Amino acid sequence: MAGVVTQNVDGLHLKAGTSPERLVEIHGNTREFVCMACGDRGPIDVVVERVRSGEEDPRCLECNGILKSATISFGQNLVPEDIDRAQSAAAVADCFLAIGTSLTVYPVAAMPEIALRAGSNLAIVNAEETPYDAYADAVIRGQIGEVLPAIVALV
């Protein structure tokens, strides 16, 4: 597996056993905090504990900047290194699986095209049509919670 690129921020891919080195959480995650000023990062539990201890609005210990969960907020730029890692994974994939995504939000929507141009097969599992359905080697319509267990049972 070249990698897993997810737009989810819930950390379930890690809990399911995906290697951190192969995981790209393109919209960030809720496990960490990030300072909006200096970029300092750490476990979100540290900030939560500071709130529990009485701090109303914990500030960055490095620069006194504003802390937030390490998720991408509306209007905030994606992390360039994450985009690069996602594009690199797409470029070396033998089979690119697009699961549970409309493939309409860029830059993630461009990943299947990168994979196809590199010679990858494309399979799409989604409840609705996507712009890449006509280019896919396989398209499965349905709810991923039902479709994926059925696929796993066949393998």
Located regions from the model:
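Conserved catalytic alpha/beta core of Sir2/sirtuin-type deacylases, generalized to analogous enzyme cores
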Residues: 1-155
